[in-house]
């Protein structure tokens, strides 16, 4: 199956499919005429006498230097190679595929001035599985993601490196093995390819998709913890949340209420419970998780716009002029990444407090210490809770906003930058930490519910426990725990736990 992209109106769901499923993509042929028209206009400008940035001039601080018409193609090649300054581990294949798809969307709007053969090469590389080797670090998020996108472009011109069928090869060899030929860049094409926010945006989208799946699962584990602790579902009453009015809170409250529906554990303490109120980590879940859902949705709107944007420079406008602007500045992406980081941090923080509640016999309303069946002889989930605290703390440290950390670059020509790529890239580690925290809560919540037998939980939560137990056996006595924690985190990350819940209960990214 090939995804057909309509540049300017590619929805979030399509971007998610590209990221998760690695499907090949193509630009809708209806956009080809606009692409070719802009390319023809760039060719005219390159042949003319008027200096236009990036077409017949140098770059950045060297923009005042005029380039002769005979050197325009050499200029584009020379632009790519010294910009390949990335460091660190290669970005994963699914991230690079998303970067390339986003670049197609941007170029496909017909304002960048690249020829159709540049578009078709990217499409063919995605179809045949030629994945440029892009190091993870090196972009400040203005002027676009220059270093990472230069590594992408290097593979296209037969330089740099690329992965093909699991092998890391030179760009030329990877293209050759796939039956493809390198492109010879024409005027402005190198600049159009490396100038843009596609790396930052792809990383932020990956963080968003991972964070949203974790947020949905955190509502499930939060409901499990509520039942395990014999908490009240009264704070999830719909009218409470309607009176405040925040959409995320309303949706989170509804999800928690529905997940707990029919629990025999809940019915058992409706009368005669001496506790007047539960701790905040139980009672305020709709307020906290709902606020996180709201900012994830706001970030999603920003990133969907950015994914469809033209972010190189200069741009060919509708009147045929090539005009320099600043769409390459990734401040919107940086802000979105910072928002996602805050949500990830807070979802993990309140989840960790519920884990701590369940292992503490002074708070868990009758559960044994650390959920060990023979406390003292067994330590139960004592150190699993400590691990969750370590992960929570690391996420707090990483949640500092990257967008406020501008520094001048390129001899002060590029004197304010977004740091969007740094802000987006850290989301991969933060969401991995969050998956592990929520996985630990799944283990504590499920075990806490099991320790309430013969009382049973709701039908929805019983499905979650069954999915967990298919991979992780219930804890009867102390055993090696690292494999349990890894398996539980994977069930969060791959959507297994959220996938067993009936449709319509868990909130979507689109409000």
From Swiss-Prot:
Annotated PROSITE patterns: PAL_HISTIDASE
Protein modification: Contains an active site 4-methylidene-imidazol-5-one (MIO), which is formed autocatalytically by cyclization and dehydration of residues Ala-Ser-Gly.
Keywords from the named record: Cytoplasm, Histidine metabolism, Lyase
Enzyme Commission number: 4.3.1.3
Listed pathway(s): Amino-acid degradation; L-histidine degradation into L-glutamate; N-formimidoyl-L-glutamate from L-histidine: step 1/3
GO cellular component: cytoplasm
Gene Ontology terms describing biological process: L-histidine catabolic process to glutamate and formamide; L-histidine catabolic process to glutamate and formate
InterPro entries the UniProt entry points to: Aromatic_Lyase, Fumarase/histidase_N, HutH, L-Aspartase-like, Phe/His_NH3-lyase_AS
HAMAP family named among the record's database cross-references: His_ammonia_lyase (MF_00229)
PANTHER family, alphabetized: HISTIDINE AMMONIA-LYASE
Similarity comment text for this entry: Belongs to the PAL/histidase family.
Stated name of the protein: Histidine ammonia-lyase
Species whose genome carries this gene: Brucella ovis (strain ATCC 25840 / 63/290 / NCTC 10512)
Gene giving rise to this polypeptide: hutH
């Amino acid at each position: 199956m090939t995804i057909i992209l309509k540049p300017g109106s590619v929805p979030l769901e399509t971007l998610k499919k590209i990221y998760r499923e690695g499907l090949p993509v193509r630009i809708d042929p209806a956009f080809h005429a606009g692409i070719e028209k802009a390319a023809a206009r760039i060719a005219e400008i390159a042949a003319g006498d008027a200096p236009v940035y990036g077409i017949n001039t140098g770059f950045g601080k060297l923009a005042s230097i005029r380039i002769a018409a005979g050197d325009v193609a050499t200029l584009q090649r020379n632009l790519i190679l010294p910009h390949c300054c990335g460091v660190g581990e290669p970005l994963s294949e699914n991230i690079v595929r998303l970067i390339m798809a986003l670049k197609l969307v941007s170029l496909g709007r017909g304002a960048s001035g690249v020829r159709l053969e540049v578009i078709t090469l990217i499409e063919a590389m995605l179809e045949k599985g030629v994945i440029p080797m892009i190091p993870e670090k090196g972009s400040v998020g203005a002027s676009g993601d220059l270093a990472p996108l230069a590594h992408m472009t290097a593979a296209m011109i037969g330089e740099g490196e690329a992965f093909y069928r699991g092998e890391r090869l030179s760009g030329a060899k990877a293209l050759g093995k796939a039956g493809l030929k390198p492109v010879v860049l024409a005027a402005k094409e190198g600049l159009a390819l490396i100038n843009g926010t596609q790396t930052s945006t792809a990383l932020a989208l990956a963080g968003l998709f991972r964070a949203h799946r974790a947020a949905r699962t955190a509502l499930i584990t939060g409901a499990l913890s509520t039942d395990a602790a014999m908490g009240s579902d009264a704070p999830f009453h719909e009218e409470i949340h309607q009176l405040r009015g925040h959409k995320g809170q309303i949706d989170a409250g509804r999800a928690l209420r529905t997940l707990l529906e029919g629990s025999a554990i809940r019915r058992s303490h409706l009368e005669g419970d001496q506790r007047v109120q539960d701790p905040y980590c139980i009672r305020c879940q709709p307020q906290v998780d709902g606020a996180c859902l709201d900012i994830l949705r706001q970030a999603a709107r920003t990133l969907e716009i950015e994914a469809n944007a033209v972010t190189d420079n200069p741009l060919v406008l509708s009147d045929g002029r090539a005009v320099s602007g600043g769409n390459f500045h990734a401040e919107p992406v940086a802000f979105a990444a910072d928002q996602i980081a805050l949500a990830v941090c807070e979802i993990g923080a309140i989840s960790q407090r519920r884990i701590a509640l369940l292992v503490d016999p002074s708070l868990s309303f009758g559960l044994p210490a650390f959920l060990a069946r023979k406390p003292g002889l067994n330590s139960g989930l004592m150190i699993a809770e400590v691990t969750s605290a370590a992960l929570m703390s690391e996420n707090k440290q990483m949640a500092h906003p990257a967008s406020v950390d501008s520094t001048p670059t390129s001899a002060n020509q590029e004197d304010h930058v977004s740091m969007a790529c740094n802000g987006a890239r850290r989301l991969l580690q933060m969401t991995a930490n969050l998956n592990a925290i929520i996985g630990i809560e799944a283990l504590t919540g499920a075990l806490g519910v099991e320790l309430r037998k013969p009382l049973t939980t709701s039908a929805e939560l019983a499905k979650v426990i069954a999915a967990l137990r298919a991979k992780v056996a219930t804890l009867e006595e102390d055993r090696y725990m690292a494999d349990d924690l890894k398996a539980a985190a994977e069930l969060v990350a791959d959507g297994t736990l959220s996938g067993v819940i009936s449709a319509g209960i868990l909130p979507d990214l689109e409000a």
